[in-house]
A protein has these predicted regions:
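Alpha/beta-hydrolase fold nucleophile elbow
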Residues: 110-127
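Short, surface-exposed "cap/lid" segments of acyl-processing enzymes
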Residues: 27-71
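Short glycine-enriched nucleophile-adjacent loop
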Residues: 130-134
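Cap/lid segment of the alpha/beta-hydrolase catalytic domain
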Residues: 68-89
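Alpha/beta-hydrolase active-site loop
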Residues: 84-113
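A generic structural signal for alpha->beta connector loops
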Residues: 17, 47, 59, 118-120
Length: 134
């Protein structure tokens, strides 16, 4: 099964944008998975891109995002060099950002398709991202 990757961007007035990557299956999606990275982590760390591909190959839309204060920047998404941003990060901020992403997906209709509005949604995460997902 073929799949595609597409960028995701959620801009909020006066705040840092939330960047992410969609993994899209070539067939009608079974549902959507939102993936949240862990503490001092980022969406491209380790196997997360391959995990997204695996979900898409299995027929799921998969979105992995970077929290805005995770220590990386859009211009250097794999480098932990934003110490000021990381120092301002909180569990509550990550919870608010994941909620904003879910609200944006609902508003855009990304959690459904042309044939159904009852597709399942899963929010999963690694380490602290798993706690935020709960």
């Amino acid at each position: 099964m073929q799949m595609q990757r597409h960028p995701f961007l959620l801009e909020k007035a006066g705040e840092r944008p939330i960047h992410g990557v969609w993994h899209i299956p070539s067939t009608e999606a079974k549902g959507t998975v939102l993936f949240l990275h862990g503490y001092k982590g980022y969406m491209d760390w380790g196997a997360w891109p391959m995990v997204g591909d695996a979900f898409a190959h299995a027929g799921w839309r998969f979105l992995r995002i970077n929290f805005t204060h995770n220590g990386t920047t859009p211009s250097a998404p794999k480098s932990f060099n934003d110490l000021e941003g990381f120092a301002a990060n909180t569990y509550s901020r990550e919870l608010e950002e994941s909620t904003a992403v879910l609200q944006a997906l609902r508003a855009e209709g990304a959690l459904s398709d042309a044939t159904a509005t009852d597709k399942p949604l899963a929010v999963i995460g690694h380490s602290r991202g798993g706690g935020v997902a709960c």
